[in-house]
Amino acid sequence: MRTRVSGWLLAAALVVHLLALYLPGSPDPGPDVVPHLDKLVHVLLFATPALLICRITSKWWPIVAMAAHAPVSELVQYRLVPHRSGDVWDLVADAVGVILGLGLASLAARRDAGASPKLGLPYGEGLEQPR
């Protein structure tokens, strides 16, 4: 059941991911209300699918595809999407997002296996289970 829900969440996350990356930008975007907020958005756009992919499958190729999609998306934005620009720092934020998604998936897997998130030890080896 959890895999089915994760699959639907992944599909939704990928739709948001693709729309956010490839919709044309505004010809006059105006001033940044929050400086560098776009970098946080890039991190989240790549971390969310990476996390969900890891929750669904142990295959490595979808994560490689996510990582490869980062520079491709920046090139497409730079060359093909009106009023968008490719940016090296966006690419860095995309890579950070993939790594963050992998890390969060690893923490979730440890938690699901009954390990302590702090030490990676199973409960009962000198640690009390939280109440």
What are these regions (language model features)?
Residues 54-78:
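Membrane-embedded catalytic cores of phosphoryl/pyrophosphoryl-handling enzymes
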Residues 1-54, 66:
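"…centered on the first transmembrane helix and the immediately adjacent amphipathic helix/loop
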Residues 32, 61, 116-120:
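Membrane-interface helix-loop junctions in multi-pass transporters/channels
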Residues 48, 64-72, 92-103:
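Hydrophobic, lipid-facing residues on alpha-helical transmembrane segments of integral membrane proteins
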Residues 1-25, 88-131:
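Terminal transmembrane helix and immediately flanking juxtamembrane interfaces
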Residues 44-60, 98-108:
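Membrane-interfacial alpha-helical segments at the cytosolic side of multi-pass membrane proteins
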Residues 4-5, 57-63, 87-88:
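Membrane-helix interface segments
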Residues 27-35, 73-98:
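Interfacial helix-loop-helix junctions of multi-pass membrane proteins
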